[in-house]
């Protein structure tokens, strides 16, 4: 790798960004070397890695969660990544507005414009700007592009530059709701402890903070009255120190018109920094666009409570075992055996020596033979004393994508991981077969515990696999560039968490990736 010659201005800019020179040079090395593929043991399934709960187990989990919420000291929080702009939702409409053809998806929007929750606002914008001509009148007169212009640009609703959080998603008799309002409604149903306060944290782009707070100032009190809850809402932005340097095709830093280095956001994995700074005992993580109207929320609410109950059960067991393993000289062999079984059965964590030599017997027998009891206990404590996450997984009925896998690490241990397609070695026939035959996908439905058995918050950066991530190819002013994406939030950023996968039904996953998704029946449900 050719050494980069930094100018004084470069070093000043790097420092102002909150990044060290060594970190930037490490990023340049990653562009040169790429990222290694993980060693996949198998795709997680019902037999290995994914819990399919029985009716009794679901009932017990619900009872556990209800009991947890009755604890006045419990702090529950919903963490919602919401920094993405809604522009991707309207990609086809942008193309149409700029002169493209009315594709099938565009025509559906024009034909069913009245079915959108934002129609009344759009109609008013059209009438104001077009001398009393409403949206439907303009569409019928062949002026669909005019209507779309009022939808997407500063002339009207500005939806092309707003975040998804502020887009009106669903109709209600009193007034429509945005995506963020649906998260508030949802939180009141499963994340409200006995105190009555629902804590939510949204990550946003800096330019969206003000309109976000403006919306809350208008709507929060009404929602508190509707759901008999008090909302404590906080926000944060992605830290500049998590940005990554951009390079050209030759892997050398590129510069802007003023000769300055170019840094780009490092992807949602950078939000591990934001997650580290929230204080909560239990944290629910869910994407901003996966919400439904109240009449369709029951399955989501029940399974959020179930996942929360499973997490509390796992957390309580882990805390108890950590207490019993504190004194390496006094921990019993039954506790050692129970810990090993707990790690294997709950998190698919196999200890290297046991995994590689099963014929030699269980860990306890090995300890007796090798006289290394204290060393093994330290290993068990290291594996046990980690953040915990319970992740809902949905059966895969379409094309494979990001999903659950059992992975073997360099030290020989195994664990459960969520891998994206870009992390899969598609050139390896066996790995590609496992990818193609995977039965579940990741809907981003997590419940997390980020505190240790003493009640201290973990340093989440200690549990990131920095060898993960990927390189994306972009362009700037028509010139190609390469960008470095940090380990994804629920991928490499949580690689060394203890992970449990639980099957959840498909009706808990209803994301809005395009504006047309809002026309699907689940998002058009009539509210009484």
Placement of each model-derived feature along the sequence:
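Domain-scale recognition of functional cores that engage charged ligands
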Residues: 14, 43-397, 406-417, 422-423, ...
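Short low-complexity stretches enriched in small and charged residues
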Residues: 29-37, 153-159, 239-242, 454-460
